Amino acid sequence: MDTLIIVGSMVTLWSEIPMDILRSVFERLSFVDLHRAKIVCSHWYSCSKQSFLRKTRSPLVILFSDDGDCTLYNPEEARVYKSKRDLSRYRFLANSGNWFLVLDPRSNLYIIDLFSEKKINLPPLDSFKGYKYNLKKVGARKFKELVSEYPTSFHHHAKDLRGLLWVDEKKEEYVVVWYFRNKYTMDSLAFCKNGEDHYREMPTHYGLHDISDMVLQRGDHIYLSTSCKYLQKLDLSRQEGIRTKNDDIISRYQLPCRPTNYKLVYDAKCWCSYNIAVTSSGEVLFVLSIFSQSTRRRIFFLYKEDPNPSPSEVIYKNLVEVDSLGDEALLLDLGITVPADSDLGIEPNSIYFTRHDRVANQKRSSPDICVFNIVTKTLKRFPGLSSLKDARWFLPS
């Protein structure tokens, strides 16, 4: 029901407030209050979209503390916001814009909008229908994997679940991908699209079961890298979602050695990590991160497949260094590049980073929220953000 309010000397409905008055009010709102205001009605939503793209599209960080609290950090405002919703019971797996893929204590999957009460219920995990695998729930957090080729079964725990998410708000479409992080089993991915009541199997190539990183691009393709130095591209664009192995793109790459042309203190507590990312044009990037625990110095290097390979490169694809992203920035938590825009606070030639091993989830990894400039080799940290269990950069939609 509309509420009567007084504007000047007139009594009107809040859904009919003139645009110029709304704009003057919206200018004074924080980005969180602006998100709350835009869901009041379609009129307010239209005004917010036309007027304040800057406030709502700057990169934000969602923070997860050790005590279970979930907060938002806006670097431009240098402010931390606490959600009015109780999100402590959820485990966040992935995100696309405002939408987050979450798992509750009963191992139920949902997609939630961080700035509203919208929630999409997803099929249960044990609705998975595979060619070689079936999944049976045997407890609130435990599952039994039945493999047709073996007489025995394997057990999984919800803490080992990994996920990817893509959402198109305009088309009201989404793609959800998940699998259990277990290098000994489950060399297939489970996925579903909007309107489906179960998860289907996306087989990966034999030998790619030890997945080290995954990227979901535009809901059409999944890129996988493995500890065995394989890269695979899976196609989800067909209606049935399954491609034959001959349609998959598989390559084996040669990881670069530690750079020797840049001054960095190497010590026993210094380690390298690798991620993959996909540019807006579809080019795959290999991201090398080097971190020194003694000096807490971190540096990144980008590589891509050699565009002019030697004829002798039959088994391994050589990589060449990338010294610029042009007018793009890399959100490593999502594994994608986005157009840079100083008005939106998205810095060009920059890598937005929190942690390197979302898939592997190694114990030695902890959040290191920073922005690294590829050209100047400078790192910007946010020292006020500490005692965190996890964190994730995202771009509000």
UniProtKB/Swiss-Prot annotation:
Pfam families: Beta-prop_KIB1-4, F-box. InterPro entries: F-box-like_dom_sf, F-box_BR-signaling, F-box_dom, KIB1-4_b-propeller. Residues 11-56 form the F-box domain. It comes from the Eukaryota. This is F-box protein At5g25290. The lineage of its organism: Eukaryota, Viridiplantae, Streptophyta, Embryophyta, Tracheophyta.
